[in-house]
Swiss-Prot record:
The keyword Flavoprotein does not apply. PANTHER family: NADH DEHYDROGENASE SUBUNIT 1, NADH-UBIQUINONE OXIDOREDUCTASE CHAIN 1. This is NADH-quinone oxidoreductase subunit H. It is found in: Cell inner membrane. Keywords: Cell inner membrane, Cell membrane, Membrane, NAD, Quinone, Translocase, Transmembrane, Transmembrane helix, Ubiquinone. The chain crosses the membrane at residues 9-29, 81-101, 113-133, 158-178, 184-204, 221-240, 245-264, 273-293, 316-336. Belongs to the complex I subunit 1 family. NDH-1 is composed of 14 different subunits. Subunits NuoA, H, J, K, L, M, N constitute the membrane sector of the complex. The lineage of its organism: Bacteria, Pseudomonadati, Pseudomonadota, Gammaproteobacteria, Legionellales. InterPro entries: NADH_UbQ_OxRdtase_su1/FPO, NADH_UbQ_OxRdtase_su1_CS.
Length: 340
């Protein structure tokens, strides 16, 4: 009984050590986004609260917490309140299988890749419930758009993950990272380049971020599925969006960029020079690269029309992933490449 209690306490400690830095990072990612996009557009960005605006996320948190939670009279009260939680929980639960470094993982399961795919697919239920429970036509239209978009883009994302499974021969995420040992040119981004590009496009679409943010298109449907939300409930949706951004960036880091592995492996001189750098530092740096790409895409690309988004998925991404999976399977079977 004592051993079980100690194990339970240790698991709770590890969960806290994962979630607290994640939630703090999400808060400051919002500041980083506003600053980066501000510089891209020749603006200053937030600079009033704290030194150079560094306390802005804290002010935003207090602002959202102190706002009144208004529940529309005609809404389905309980579903309305549950919807933000349904969006946030899968984005946090998926971190259970993400390896930050060798042995640094909460649950080292052999079906980690499948678990991640399942968790990233569940968030849409919160959006659907929010659109339905709000009893608003704008919220409902936004929820329907989001559901169709996410379900469609899950197909090429699933095919991209199948390609990773073929290349690695395992669904264990630590095993996938170790399969990429050897340096920058041994990471899966190179032999699986079309699948890497496809995964990233689908990841942006799955998180409803620009330029795929038609689910909350301000110019068409006000604010989409969360138009009726305010205060803490809106904050949960906001948190879920950015938590999903960090999650899909972490997945891309693990399955395509070698996770915690150093990019200087196998390079004489540089490998020993950077041998002191902990694996988690490389992991965070690679993850930050993907987060910056989110900022860049939001600042650069205009919002696509809904029909353009669907056409890109069904007529471009799905055929590309199918063809590349076939080529990949043949390359592995007949040993056409030294990468796999």
């Amino acid at each position: 009984m004592t051993d079980q209690l100690i194990t339970l306490i240790w698991i709770i400690i590890k969960i806290v050590l994962i979630l607290v830095p994640l939630l703090v990072a999400v808060a400051f990612i919002t500041l980083a986004e506003r600053k980066v996009i501000g510089y891209m557009q020749s603006r200053v960005g937030p600079n009033r609260v704290g030194f150079r605006g560094l306390a802005q996320p804290i002010a935003d948190i207090f602002k959202l917490l102190l706002k009144e939670v208004i529940i529309p009279t005609a809404s389905s009260r309980y579903l309305y309140l549950i919807a933000p939680i349904l969006s946030l929980v899968p984005a946090l639960a998926a971190w259970a299988v993400i390896p930050f470094a060798q042995g640094w993982v909460l649950a080292n399961v052999n079906a980690g890749l499948l678990f991640l795919f399942a968790m990233t697919s569940l968030g849409v239920y919160g959006i659907l419930v929010a659109g339905w429970a709000s009893n608003s036509k704008y919220a409902f239209f936004g929820a329907l758009r989001s559901a169709a978009q996410v379900v469609s883009y899950e197909i090429p994302m699933g095919f991209a993950l199948v390609g990773v499974l073929l290349a690695a021969g395992t669904m264990n995420l630590q095993g996938i990272v170790l399969r990429q040992s050897g340096g920058l040119w041994h990471w899966f981004w190179l032999p699986l380049l079309p699948l890497f590009v496809t995964y990233w496009i689908t990841a942006v679409a799955e998180t409803n971020r620009a330029p795929f943010d038609v689910a909350e298109g301000e110019s068409e449907i006000v604010a989409g599925f969360h138009v009726e939300y305010a205060g803490v409930t809106f904050a949960l949706f906001f948190l879920a969006e950015y938590a999903n951004m960090v999650l899909v960036s972490a997945i891309a880091t693990v399955i395509f960029l070698g996770g915690w592995l150093s990019p200087f492996q196998g390079i004489p001189g540089l490998e020993s020079l950077f041998a002191w750098v902990p694996g988690i530092v490389w992991f965070v740096l690679k993850l930050s690269l993907f987060i910056f790409t989110y900022f860049w895409m939001r600042a650069t690309f205009p919002r696509y029309r809904y029909d353009q988004i669907m056409r890109l998925c069904w007529k471009v991404l799905i055929p590309v992933t199918l063809v590349w999976i076939i080529i990949l399977a043949l390359a592995i079977e007949f040993h056409w490449t030294h990468w796999l």
